[in-house]
């Protein structure tokens, strides 16, 4: 079987080629990625910039890019803990060879980075970066329990070496990276014995990734990538259990060809994911872990007119794990300009949520060790909206959507048969609809403001993994109503002031078969950045200024008011 698997991998490598995704991190290392700009506006601000005006007499095709809004399904982890990049400064790599950054604050929060370019020619680029993020402070539980506090500890160290070569008509990228992450499971066990006795879990992850894509039009345009990950952990479900590890291989390919002239394309995308887990002898027969293989094909046609774009395609997903499955779902998008600055869009998509070990670690590192979450399937997801730009620098987006997912997972604190410090996945069928609006304003150039309001509606059925079913099934740990506000004010050419606010309510969890309503997230943050000179920048940021008490997951409290400050030195 393994010989066949490796033969399949080799065949996919030769078939898919390599894809340039410009030094992107893996899903796991995104937890550590630094935002190279100190720009506290909404993360999706790029997607809501004002649409270009069609000018005469030059005929220019309007910008009708598909509006695939990626709204979060759970409260952002970064609002609870100071994450790398929260107060990072702009690194003008074109002028400087490298940088050193260090921030520190209460709760022993530390955020550091070092980066250097070894080579930066027109055709070859080599650079290296090292990131550090850690915390080691006491936090209070929000439940009535003794002891009522615990030390939350984590330390992530990430290093990456990148190489890029620019050919005449294509670009090739390759990088290697290593992540060493250690942390404790600080969840509330309500006085029960801690399974890992507060020892540090450790994840080690090695990643090698290469990619290639054409930069000039070709008879057949190509874009491909290949990625290999090796990961291992230190502890299983107890101190004496065998630990978890394995290999993950990902390959992607996009081939398309112009037809009927213009920007019309016919193409096919392919994707392969293979996760091969090490055998764990200490698991019971009903806990055996299956390898995961998924092969996806997405044939599509892309059509464009003067003021519209349309993509018609389908997702064909073949999944092989403990049982073999075939799924088909739509992949259709349409957008059109209805006036000089306004547009409408509609998308109908679907697909498979892989939920590999690395996917789940990115969502929450506190998942029960040696646990694999079953893949989910979305037969269809529909979203649409209107983007209205009445004034230059002012934009309103109204949106809504509806989605059905089979085997959606909900992470809750393990409470049966007794409380433990881990999160476990419950699986159920989820219907999720939402409506909302975004406003982005930069009418007065020194001030940029982005506001998003969203209301979610959930319906849950066929939940698996419950020992005792509550009177009502909830979409556990998914917010009902959200408000996200970010503002940046450039007081001078050297001083920037920022303000951020995130609110989420109607959050639920479950413990001992009883629904538990979580406290609202009511997080206000403020910060400032000052450029002392071209080489030195200092910054200060405060999170959770209201010192609100709430759980990220039931039994996993967030830090109270926390302040970080530091500097960036560019050389």
Language model regions located:
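Repeated loop/turn-to-beta-strand initiation elements of outer-membrane beta-barrel proteins
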Residues: 123-126, 169-173, 217-223, 259-268, ...
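Outer-membrane beta-barrel domain signature, especially the mid-to-C-terminal portions
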Residues: 359-375, 405-429, 457-484, 502-531, ...
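Flexible loop and strand-edge segments within Gram-negative outer membrane beta-barrel domains
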Residues: 135-139, 146-158, 172-221, 227-248
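Outer-membrane beta-barrel "beta-signal"
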Residues: 65-67, 529-530, 535-539, 559-571
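Transmembrane beta-strands of outer-membrane beta-barrel pores
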Residues: 104-106, 132-136, 167-169, 178-184, ...
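Outer-membrane beta-barrel translocator/receptor signature
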Residues: 81-84, 91-140, 153-159
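Residues that define the transmembrane beta-barrel architecture of outer-membrane proteins
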Residues: 94-96, 108-110, 153-157, 200-206, ...
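Residues on the lipid-exposed face of transmembrane beta-strands in outer-membrane beta-barrel proteins
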Residues: 114-118, 159-165, 208-214, 251-257, ...
């Amino acid at each position: 079987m393994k010989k066949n698997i490796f033969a399949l991998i080799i065949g996919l490598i030769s078939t898919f080629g390599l894809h340039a995704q410009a030094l992107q991190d893996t899903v796991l290392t995104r937890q550590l990625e630094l935002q190279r700009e100190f720009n506290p506006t909404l993360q999706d601000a790029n997607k809501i910039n004002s649409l270009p005006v069609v000018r005469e007499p030059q005929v220019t095709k309007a910008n009708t890019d598909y509006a695939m809004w990626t709204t979060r399904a759970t409260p952002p982890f970064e609002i609870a803990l100071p994450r790398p990049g929260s107060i990072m400064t702009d690194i003008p790599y074109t002028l400087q060879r490298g940088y050193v950054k260090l921030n520190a604050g209460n709760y022993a929060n530390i955020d550091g980075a070092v980066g250097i370019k070894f080579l930066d020619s027109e055709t070859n680029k080599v650079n290296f970066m090292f990131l550090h993020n850690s915390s080691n402070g006491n936090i209070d539980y929000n439940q009535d329990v003794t002891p009522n506090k615990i030390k939350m500890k984590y330390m992530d160290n990430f290093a990456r070496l990148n190489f890029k070569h620019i050919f005449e008509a294509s670009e090739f990228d390759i990088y290697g990276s290593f992540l060493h992450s250690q942390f404790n499971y600080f969840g509330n066990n309500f006085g029960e014995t801690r399974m890992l006795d507060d020892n540090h879990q450790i994840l080690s992850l090695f990643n090698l990734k290469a990619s290639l894509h054409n930069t000039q039009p070709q008879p057949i345009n190509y874009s491909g990538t290949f990625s290999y990950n090796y990961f291992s952990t230190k502890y299983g479900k107890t101190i004496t259990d065998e630990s978890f590890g394995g290999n993950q291989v990902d390959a992607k390919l996009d081939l398309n060809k112009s037809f009927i002239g213009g920007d019309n394309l016919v193409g096919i995308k392919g994707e392969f994911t293979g996760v091969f887990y090490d055998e764990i002898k200490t698991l019971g027969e009903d806990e055996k872990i299956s390898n995961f293989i998924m092969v996806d094909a997405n044939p599509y046609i892309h059509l464009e007119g003067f003021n519209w774009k349309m993509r018609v395609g389908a997702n064909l997903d073949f999944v092989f794990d403990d049982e073999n499955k075939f799924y088909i779902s739509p992949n259709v998008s349409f957008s059109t300009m209805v006036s000089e600055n306004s547009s409408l869009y509609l998308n109908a998509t679907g697909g498979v949520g892989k939920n590999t070990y690395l996917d789940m670690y990115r969502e929450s590192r506190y998942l029960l060790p040696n646990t694999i979450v079953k893949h989910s399937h979305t037969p269809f997801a529909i979203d649409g909206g209107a983007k209205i730009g009445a004034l230059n620098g002012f934009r309103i987006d109204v949106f809504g959507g509806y989605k059905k997912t089979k085997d959606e997972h909900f992470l809750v604190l393990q409470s049966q048969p007794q409380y433990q410090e881990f999160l476990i996945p419950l699986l159920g069928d989820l219907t999720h609809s939402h409506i909302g609006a975004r406003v982005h304003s930069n009418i007065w150039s020194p001030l940029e403001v982005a506001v998003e309001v969203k209301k979610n509606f959930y319906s849950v059925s066929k939940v698996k993994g419950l020992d005792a079913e509550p009177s009502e099934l909830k979409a556990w740990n998914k917010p009902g109503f959200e408000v996200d506000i970010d503002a940046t004010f450039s007081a001078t050419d050297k001083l920037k002031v920022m303000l951020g606010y995130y609110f989420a309510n109607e959050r639920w969890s479950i413990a001992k078969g009883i629904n538990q309503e979580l406290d609202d997230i009511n997080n206000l943050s403020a910060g400032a950045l000052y450029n002392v000179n071209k080489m030195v920048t200092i910054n200060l940021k405060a999170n959770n200024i209201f010192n609100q008490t709430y759980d990220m997951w039931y039994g996993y409290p967030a830090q109270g008011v926390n302040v970080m400050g530091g500097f960036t030195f560019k050389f």
